[in-house]
């Protein structure tokens, strides 16, 4: 077939690239580029003088390696009206950077541009060529690709979701080929507008099903919606009120407290509402200027079992109260219920969605991600004294913190649906009480008050605006840490690792146990001998086949520290506070394991927490993002909880390690043992924590592969993977620290093409 194609190919055009914007050469060759902004662009110029741009059906081939946050390539086409997103084509790529894609370029195309990514990062473009092909070749190439994917993905859920089948290949080849492109790693994610249209717009049949489901509710609590009306835009207030009237669940009341300084138009509107509907309660305040006072007055009028605090500018989805009451019926004793949220503009266009995780205490201590979408048990709010004026501007966060303090984790519930639409920042009158430095200071004081019963805890500005860093104390004298490092012929990497421990670590009370697993190279053997002469280093010999779990369990038996630090020999500390930061969290009684922020040698993220379910198994959050990138909703720069962290740098108390029986050396000798350990730590009732304030380099290769190079390794890898699937059901697990609306195909927190929607009416 490949010999046949050249005879029917018309021509191939090879292109060179010229930077247009946000690009600079990063090396001595013309292949390596640095993206300096969010929209890097190359002009594509034919290498041969006089060549015209290919058109019609073409075959695009390239090799383009990228590191950054949003790695979707797009080809822009100018047919005479200039370049625009409307005339552009997504060019999918494999994880390795290979591009082989059939597209159709209009006949009147004059120029081409390439956007390699949509973020800062690095790009290596080895070559790019476009070949005009005949209709026959197009069909054969499409069939060849689809058939290959049918065989490769035949037993996967992804192939089923996209309907990649033999039958579809025969009846809808073009559609099947386009969907096969979505199976490639760097393909275009679902945009939020499409998500809203496909998955977040209720059809009449679904509304009918919701009504039938509500008729079966054992609990039908009255929900009191509180709106403090201060300095209001009457049009936005009307939108907020209308969103309450539009609720599918009808057992609600609306309690509004009106600032005395709001104008007569607002007073007249609300007065007429209350006269027309007994569910509307309006309190007119004699004083003005305090959102806390208005909120308390609205709370005083509430008769509901639960209260919803609705900002005067915000909008509820029509099913918001239904989802809340569905959760109340699913679980007893809920105190706090919160949801996902997005932003809405004056035209009703929604954007900037934030899909929250389930209850994530340490993320909540890093940023207020739930109070504006929260529902509370009314009796608890009243028992706590309602809203406190001394935290004006941060009163909602203060209330949420006090409710959290009086609740256990099972009483805090997340609904993975977009139930709140916040007024888009920058819209007229959209500023709310949580914005601004005064609000941040009020929230910081509220957070400090939350920790006031824990001596030594301090709260300061986080790495991102509007966020917080909570520091936990280390007692004096500091507990001893045992750093455990397995190695086999680690050589220069081990030297770099040890040098950083001794010369770039501010924590003083530690010992190092290096486990030599049959090193043979003279450089490593000599270095280990020199290490053994240090008073706080022990070199242990492990003369058995490599078993990561067994090696670490063996070393732990020789440890004398209260704290264990499991460290790979290819890891290097970047800044001196890394171990102190990790130990300070590991000493917290509710924290069972602590992970660090690991960067590849070139500074891009290797590990920022482990998300279960990605790729049907697990993967590292924000992998390949720039080190300083905030990540999704700031999560690459915030202390938070994850289901697991990597064992390449993992700190935990020794008593926790014993409580979960250490690493599983029988079933997981090489792979997945760190994930399994963390999942057992969580199963034992502890939280796993990741901190961005402990930064180390991990010199693991980008192209490490899947550990299946030989038949023996392949068989062992499959045994370990199957064991994890059996023990933890990782292919079915909804990671509580992720969100089921987000993709399981990549590590970039983009929206899933087929989200696992929370639809309680279907249960």
Model-derived features: where do they sit?
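Cell-envelope/extracellular polymer assembly enzymes that use nucleotide-activated donors
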Residues: 221-226, 253, 398, 479-484, ...
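Short aromatic/hydrophobic "clamp" motif used to bind/position activated sugar donors
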Residues: 307, 564
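Conserved nucleotide-sugar donor-binding catalytic segment
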Residues: 361-448, 652, 662-665
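Non-catalytic membrane-proximal stalk/linker segments that position and tether the catalytic domains
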Residues: 2-22, 31-32, 80, 136-222, ...
């Amino acid at each position: 077939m490949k010999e046949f194609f050249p005879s029917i190919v018309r021509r191939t055009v090879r292109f060179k690239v010229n930077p247009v914007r946000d690009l600079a050469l990063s090396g001595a060759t013309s292949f390596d580029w640095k993206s300096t902004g969010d929209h890097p662009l190359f002009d594509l110029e034919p290498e041969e003088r006089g060549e015209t741009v290919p058109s019609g059906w073409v075959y695009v081939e390239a090799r383009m390696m990228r590191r950054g946050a949003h790695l979707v390539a797009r080809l822009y086409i100018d047919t005479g009206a200039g370049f625009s997103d409307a005339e552009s084509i997504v060019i999918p790529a494999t994880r390795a950077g290979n591009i082989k894609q059939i597209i159709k370029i209009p006949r009147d195309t004059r120029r081409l541009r390439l956007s390699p990514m949509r973020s800062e990062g690095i790009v290596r473009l080895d070559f790019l060529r476009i070949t005009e092909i005949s209709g026959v070749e197009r069909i054969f190439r499409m069939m060849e690709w689809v058939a290959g994917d049918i065989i490769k993905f035949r037993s996967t859920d992804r192939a089923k979701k996209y309907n990649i089948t033999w039958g579809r290949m025969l009846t809808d080849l073009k559609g099947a080929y386009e969907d096969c492109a979505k199976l490639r790693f760097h393909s275009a994610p679902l945009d939020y507008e499409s998500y809203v249209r496909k998955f977040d717009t209720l059809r009449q049949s679904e509304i009918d099903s919701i009504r039938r489901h509500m008729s079966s509710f054992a609990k039908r609590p009255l929900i009191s919606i509180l709106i403090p009306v201060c300095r209001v835009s009457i049009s936005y207030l009307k939108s907020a009120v209308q969103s309450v009237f539009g609720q599918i669940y009808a057992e609600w009341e609306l309690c509004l407290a009106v600032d005395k300084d709001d104008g007569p138009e607002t007073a007249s509107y609300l007065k007429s509402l209350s006269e027309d509907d007994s569910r509307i309660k309006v309190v007119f305040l004699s004083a003005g200027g305090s959102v806390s006072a208005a909120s308390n007055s609205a709370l005083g009028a509430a008769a509901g079992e639960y209260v919803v605090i609705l900002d005067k500018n915000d909008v509820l989805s029509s099913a918001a109260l239904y989802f809340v009451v569905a959760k109340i019926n699913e679980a007893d004793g809920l105190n706090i219920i919160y949801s996902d949220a997005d932003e809405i503009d004056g035209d009703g266009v929604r954007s900037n969605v934030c899909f929250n995780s389930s209850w994530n205490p340490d993320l909540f201590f890093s940023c207020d991600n739930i109070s504006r979408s929260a529902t509370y048990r009314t009796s608890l709010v009243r028992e706590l004294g309602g809203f406190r004026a001394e935290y004006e501007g941060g009163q909602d966060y203060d209330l949420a913190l006090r409710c959290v303090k009086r609740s256990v984790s099972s009483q805090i519930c997340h609904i993975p649906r977009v139930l709140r639409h916040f007024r888009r920042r920058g819209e007229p009158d959209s500023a709310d009480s949580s914005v601004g430095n005064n609000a941040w200071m009020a929230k910081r004081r509220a957070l400090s008050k939350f920790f006031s019963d824990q001596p030594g805890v301090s709260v300061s500005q986080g790495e991102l605006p509007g966020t917080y860093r909570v520091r936990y104390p280390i007692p004096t004298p500091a507990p001893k840490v045992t750093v455990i490092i397995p190695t086999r012929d680690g050589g220069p990497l081990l030297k770099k690792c040890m040098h950083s421990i001794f010369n770039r670590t501010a924590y003083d009370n530690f010992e190092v146990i290096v486990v030599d697993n049959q090193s043979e190279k003279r450089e490593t053997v000599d270095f280990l001998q020199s290490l053994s002469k240090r008073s706080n280093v022990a070199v242990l010999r492990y003369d058995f086949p490599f078993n990561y779990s067994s090696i670490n369990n063996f070393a732990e038996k020789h440890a004398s520290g209260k704290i264990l630090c499991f460290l790979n020999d290819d890891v290097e500390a970047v800044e001196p506070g890394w171990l102190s930061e990790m130990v300070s969290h590991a000493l917290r009684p509710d924290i069972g394991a602590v992970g660090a922020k690991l960067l590849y040698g070139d500074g891009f993220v290797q590990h920022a927490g482990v998300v279960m379910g990605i790729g049907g198994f697990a993967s590292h959050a924000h992998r390949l993002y720039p080190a300083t990138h905030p990540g999704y909703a700031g999560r690459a720069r915030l202390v938070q909880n994850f289901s697991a962290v990597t064992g390449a740098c993992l700190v935990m108390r020794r008593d926790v390690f014993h409580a979960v029986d250490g690493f599983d050396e029988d079933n997981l000798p090489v792979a997945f043992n760190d994930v399994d350990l963390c999942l057992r730590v969580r199963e034992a009732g502890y939280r796993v924590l990741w901190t961005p304030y402990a930064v180390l380099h991990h010199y693991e290769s980008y192209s490490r592969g899947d550990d299946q190079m030989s038949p023996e390794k392949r068989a062992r890898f499959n045994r370990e993977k199957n064991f994890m699937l059996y023990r933890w059901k990782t292919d079915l697990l909804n990671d509580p620290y992720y969100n089921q609306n987000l993709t399981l195909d990549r590590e970039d927190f983009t929206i899933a093409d087929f989200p696992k929607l929370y639809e309680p009416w279907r249960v």
